[in-house]
Curated annotation (Swiss-Prot):
<feature type="binding site">
    <location>
        <begin position="42"/>
        <end position="49"/>
    </location>
    <ligand>
        <name>ATP</name>
    </ligand>
</feature>
<dbReference type="InterPro" id="IPR027417">
    <property type="entry name" value="P-loop_NTPase"/>
</dbReference>
<dbReference type="Pfam" id="PF00005">
    <property type="entry name" value="ABC_tran"/>
</dbReference>
<dbReference type="GO" id="GO:0015439">
    <property type="term" value="F:ABC-type heme transporter activity"/>
</dbReference>
<dbReference type="GO" id="GO:0005886">
    <property type="term" value="C:plasma membrane"/>
</dbReference>
<dbReference type="GO" id="GO:0017004">
    <property type="term" value="P:cytochrome complex assembly"/>
</dbReference>
<keyword id="KW-1278">Translocase</keyword>
<keyword id="KW-0067">ATP-binding</keyword>
<keyword id="KW-0201">Cytochrome c-type biogenesis</keyword>
<comment type="subunit">
    <text>The complex is composed of two ATP-binding proteins (CcmA) and two transmembrane proteins (CcmB).</text>
</comment>
<dbReference type="GO" id="GO:0016887">
    <property type="term" value="F:ATP hydrolysis activity"/>
</dbReference>
<keyword id="KW-0472">Membrane</keyword>
<keyword id="KW-0547">Nucleotide-binding</keyword>
<dbReference type="InterPro" id="IPR003439">
    <property type="entry name" value="ABC_transporter-like_ATP-bd"/>
</dbReference>
<dbReference type="InterPro" id="IPR003593">
    <property type="entry name" value="AAA+_ATPase"/>
</dbReference>
<keyword id="KW-0997">Cell inner membrane</keyword>
<comment type="similarity">
    <text>Belongs to the ABC transporter superfamily. CcmA exporter (TC 3.A.1.107) family.</text>
</comment>
Amino acid sequence: MSKKNSTPLISAVNLTCIREERLLFDELSLQINAGDIVQVEGPNGSGKTSLLRILSGLSQPYDGQILYREQLISHCREEFHQNLLYFGHLSGVKGEMTAEENLDFNLALHGNKTQESLSYLAKVNLSGFEECLASHLSAGQHRRIALARLYQSNVPIWILDEPFTAIDKQGVASLERLFSLHAERGGCVILTTHQDLISIKPEQIKKITLDYSYDSAVD
């Protein structure tokens, strides 16, 4: 991972988002730099997941642009996605593989076969489930397998939608420490959560609040 520099990792310029004829946010601009931990806040339905999907290039805004290192992501999509880890509501876990095999598969995809998957599963409270087929595990356990990939990841941009769901207090604290370390190494973390980030220094956290004051229908 590269060291911190003055070029923003992600820039959003005048984003407008409309879903089901509702205006969620309008002319939203932001810059996310290496070292940033950005917490997106707002009530349910305010557009938090929509914003994360737009920032990750998985959804298109009604208007506005997303840039990666000052280039439109449409011009560098492959490079952008190689430097992005997105954690959404779908885990991406393969049911025909065990929990350990899912992590080994992820390591193999990224050209790194030397790290120990068992220790990562322990960090997300899945010790004892290493040899269980993922198809026999719960949805919450699938999310924990997906979260274990964070401990394997060297990509700079992490975009995480409610990463603390189904994680106990010890696991949350461990993830928060990981986020701080990732930021200190020159990465960035963009996440939604209703929890306070108590293990992260307040000066490390930037907050974006989505809370449109009226339910605006679009003609």
